[in-house]
């Protein structure tokens, strides 16, 4: 059969909508077209995928290849579609069986040698994949991040050949076993503050009652120091909230913070940030 459909995920803020990579091989002069609103990095995947397939000792089909990234109205950006496109071409050309395609999602960048490279902002995709009850095949470099999502089968690979062997059933990929999570205990504590009894009492009342709190005074009196200790008074995040915070860090490429922590985040914008709205919400040119 010369038509194959592979599942992957796009990046849209902290959302990860499903993308179906539809690959069709037809007769005619050899050509390679990608449609479905692809950005520049996605268009460039044609060269990466071709080289990866050839260097992995597969046969690149000398036919007219049309790839549709559906839904077509959703913008596609980044290199995360490389693996799904390659698997779709191999499946449509009969070099990889289609039996297990529906049970998996594929996300990863391909090197010219066929090696798998990690991508940014994977955690929202892993969360969405878990909701759809599919296994996720990714680069080993993304395995720890994806494993933060419970009830998700994470299948890390280092090369396109490993993914092919898994699809054939010869050498199934082993599910990633995350190491025990060590939660951060370095949060500033209110008992470290000497003095400021009235301010500390105000923090306790605001934390227990869920009230807003305004701290004002001359520079150097400890306003930021006190505010940074408010998360230590608040209840821990539940699992869904912790994953949402980690997803935001993942999208912001703060990989050092994209970990499963139950501590509530603390943000401290500069005092001059109120001059413009973009300083608070981001954006601009």
Locate the predicted segments by residue.
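Peripheral, non-AAA+ core regions of ATP-driven protein-machinery
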Residues: 1-228
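Walker A/P-loop
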Residues: 215-259
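Short, exposed beta-strand "edge-strand" segments with a Pro/Gly-rich flavor and a Y/T-containing core
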Residues: 151-158, 230-237, 267-275
């Amino acid at each position: 059969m010369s038509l194959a459909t592979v599942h992957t995920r796009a990046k849209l803020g902290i959302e990860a909508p499903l993308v179906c990579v539809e690959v069709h091989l037809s007769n005619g002069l050899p050509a390679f077209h990608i449609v479905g609103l692809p950005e520049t990095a996605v268009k460039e995947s044609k060269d990466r995928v071709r080289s990866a397939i050839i260097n992995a000792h597969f046969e690149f089909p000398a036919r007219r290849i049309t790839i549709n990234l559906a839904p077509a109205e959703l913008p596609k950006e980044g290199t995360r579609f490389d693996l799904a496109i390659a698997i779709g071409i191999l499946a449509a050309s009969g070099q990889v069986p289609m039996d297990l395609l529906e049970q998996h999602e594929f996300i990863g960048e391909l090197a010219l040698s066929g090696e798998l490279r990690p991508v940014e902002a994977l955690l929202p995709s892993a969360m969405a994949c878990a909701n759809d009850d599919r296994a996720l095949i990714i680069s080993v470099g993304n395995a720890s991040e994806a494993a933060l999502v419970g009830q998700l089968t994470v299948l890390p690979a280092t090369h396109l050949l490993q993914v092919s062997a898994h699809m054939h059933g010869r050498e199934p990929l082993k599910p990633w076993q995350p190491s025990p999570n060590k939660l951060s205990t370095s949060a500033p504590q209110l008992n470290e503050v000497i003095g400021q009894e009235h301010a500390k009492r105000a923090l306790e009342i605001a934390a227990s009652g869920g009230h807003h709190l305004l701290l004002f005074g001359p520079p150097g009196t400890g306003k930021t120091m006190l505010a940074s200790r408010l998360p230590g008074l608040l209840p821990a995040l539940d699992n869904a909230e912790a994953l949402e915070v980690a997803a935001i860090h993942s999208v912001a490429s703060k990989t050092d913070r994209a970990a499963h922590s139950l501590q509530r985040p603390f943000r401290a914008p500069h005092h001059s940030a109120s001059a413009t709205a973009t300083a608070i919400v981001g954006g601009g040119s």
